[in-house]
């Protein structure tokens, strides 16, 4: 049985930085069930004390020391959070002092700098990419001329969350195409995709894991049947191989890793926002 550990991502901004780094760290450890909670915009002492109380309550509930991944810039807020007795992991602390020495300059304690709306062009690019991902989700729209990437996979293999992550974090216009039973009758690309071969990236998944995911969505249906999952995954993988479409298994791969692999494979040079 997995050991439960409560984890809090605390930030004076959106919390994206703390959560991204924290998630990457936690994936290095097995045998634990991490109960995570993101606390965003903890930017004054009152909010910090409220956060401290919630963290303490979690420790009492689970009878174990909570873990806090903290990206608050104001050190006075971090001190309040530390009163919770949690293990405090400061996102910036290991890097600020060496950088200050190297650059001979003190940091600017600017709240929300990592994900602020300082660059409006960048902000609008992310919003437009997000709208594109939603419009072109699950084959809703099939005009892919403006797409940077088109993720192709069977249903519930991780297409949608990856597209949204690519949009929000990289401003990438990511569409996705769900392979249907009709598509899988052939080992060739569906007609709608043939003109966009260079934009395609295939996602595959272990059939047992796919069955678990589908069972949660449509219990005891043909859609969630293990044989159906095996047949669809096998047919999709044959298609990807025949058409030489780059492919990645999402079974044990985080969205962050999938996104990085997609960008690198398709040669999309984008900075993380």
From Swiss-Prot:
Function: Bifunctional serine/threonine kinase and phosphorylase involved in the regulation of the phosphoenolpyruvate synthase (PEPS) by catalyzing its phosphorylation/dephosphorylation.
UniProt keyword Transferase, yes or no: yes
Transmembrane intervals: none
A GO term for molecular function: phosphotransferase activity, phosphate group as acceptor
NCBIfam families: PRK05339.1
UniProt name for this protein: Putative phosphoenolpyruvate synthase regulatory protein
EC numbers on record: 2.7.11.33, 2.7.4.28
Disulfide linkage: none
Family matches, as Pfam families: Kinase-PPPase
Family (UniProt): Belongs to the pyruvate, phosphate/water dikinase regulatory protein family. PSRP subfamily.
Keywords assigned by UniProt, alphabetized: Kinase, Nucleotide-binding, Serine/threonine-protein kinase, Transferase
InterPro entries referenced in this protein's UniProt entry, alphabetically: Kinase-pyrophosphorylase, PSRP
Binding annotation for ADP: 153-160
Catalytic reactions of this protein: [pyruvate, water dikinase] + ADP = [pyruvate, water dikinase]-phosphate + AMP + H(+); [pyruvate, water dikinase]-phosphate + phosphate + H(+) = [pyruvate, water dikinase] + diphosphate
């Amino acid at each position: 049985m997995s050991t439960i550990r409560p984890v809090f991502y605390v930030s004076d901004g959106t919390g994206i930085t703390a959560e991204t780094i924290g998630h990457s760290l936690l994936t290095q450890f097995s045998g634990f069930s991490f109960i995570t909670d993101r606390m965003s915009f903890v930017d004054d002492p009152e909010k910090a004390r409220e956060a401290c109380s919630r963290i303490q309550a979690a420790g009492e509930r689970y009878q174990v020391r909570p873990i806090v991944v903290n990206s608050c810039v104001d050190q006075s807020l971090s001190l309040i959070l530390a009163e919770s007795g949690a293990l405090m992991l400061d996102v910036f602390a290991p890097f600020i002092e060496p950088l200050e020495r190297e650059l001979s300059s003190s940091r600017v304690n600017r709240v929300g700098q990592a994900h602020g709306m300082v660059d409006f062009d960048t902000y609008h690019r992310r919003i437009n990419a997000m709208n594109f991902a939603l419009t072109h989700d699950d084959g809703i729209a099939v005009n892919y001329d403006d797409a940077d990437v088109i993720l192709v996979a069977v249903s519930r293999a991780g297409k949608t969350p990856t597209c949204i992550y690519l949009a929000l974090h990289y401003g990438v216009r990511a569409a996705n195409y769900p392979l249907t039973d009709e598509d899988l009758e052939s080992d060739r690309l569906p007609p709608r995709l043939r003109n966009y071969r260079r934009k395609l990236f295939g996602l595959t998944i272990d059939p047992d894991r796919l069955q678990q995911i589908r069972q949660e969505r449509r219990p005891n249906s043909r859609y969630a049947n293990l044989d159906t999952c095996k047949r669809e995954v096998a047919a999709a993988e044959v298609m990807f191989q025949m058409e030489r479409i780059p492919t990645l298994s999402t079974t044990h791969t985080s969205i962050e890793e999938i996104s990085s692999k997609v960008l690198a494979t398709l040669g999309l040079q984008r900075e993380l926002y």
